[in-house]
């Protein structure tokens, strides 16, 4: 098994590298300044993980990837984290490979991962333009497209988080809390770890 982490921030290593240094990471670490990973795997929040086998097949789509379970409280609103279940399933897959109860069939994978809607595709294109303008030193134009992406797909927390990062940690935290407290749905979707049918030998 190999763990690969991808920190996604238009600020590149300057913005994201310090977190790897602080963690003394012993696994492969990448800095994704263009958010290519989120785009490819439809990530909308962090931490999110995908399982990819030795053949390059994606075994499970993006899911909240915590390592322990707990319930946090922010402004009187609960944030439930399901880490223990995720790690247990991951260990089963590492041990059993394609025979794991948690390795999804192609049909089940397709059922869980839907193509982006036209609105979501426009949001993604707007976000990519924002990233390009930000890295080209044109923050005003970047801000216009960051805002457009967030309006089109308000459920994508990565869009919000990246734009908020330019406000400083304190203001970004306040914006996150305001949006979090207005949520009608869970911040992290419940992990669908119901075991899939074993693959035939």
Predicted regions: what they are:
Residues 127-128, 160-163:
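Alpha-solenoid helical repeat scaffolds
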Residues 120, 152-154:
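Short coil turns that delineate tetratricopeptide repeat
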Residues 166-194:
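Alpha-helical linker/edge segments of TPR/alpha-solenoid repeat scaffolds
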Residues 24-28, 41-50:
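Structural micro-motif
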Residues 1-22, 33, 37:
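Structural microenvironment flanking redox-active thiols in thiol-disulfide oxidoreductases
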Residues 53-138:
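Thiol-/selenol-based redox modules, centered on thioredoxin-like
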């Amino acid at each position: 098994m190999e763990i690969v982490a991808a920190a996604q921030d238009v600020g590149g290593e300057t913005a994201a590298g310090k977190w790897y240094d602080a963690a003394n990471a012993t696994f492969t670490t990448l800095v994704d300044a263009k958010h290519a990973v989120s785009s490819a795997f439809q990530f909308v929040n962090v931490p999110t993980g995908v399982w990819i086998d030795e053949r390059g097949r994606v075994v499970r789509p993006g899911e909240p990837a915590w390592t322990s379970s707990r319930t946090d409280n922010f402004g009187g609103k609960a944030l439930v984290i399901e880490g223990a279940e995720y790690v247990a399933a991951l260990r089963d897959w590492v041990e059993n490979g394609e025979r794991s109860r948690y390795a999804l069939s192609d049909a089940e994978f397709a059922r869980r991962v839907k193509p982006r809607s036209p609105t979501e595709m426009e949001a993604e294109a707007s976000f990519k333009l924002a990233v390009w303008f930000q890295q080209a030193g044109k923050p005003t134009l970047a801000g216009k497209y960051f805002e457009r992406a967030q309006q089109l797909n308000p459920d994508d927390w990565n869009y919000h988080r990246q734009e908020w990062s330019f406000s400083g940690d304190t203001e970004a935290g306040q914006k996150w809390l305001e949006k979090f407290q207005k949520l009608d749905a869970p911040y992290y979707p419940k992990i669908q770890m119901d075991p899939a049918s074993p693959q035939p030998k």
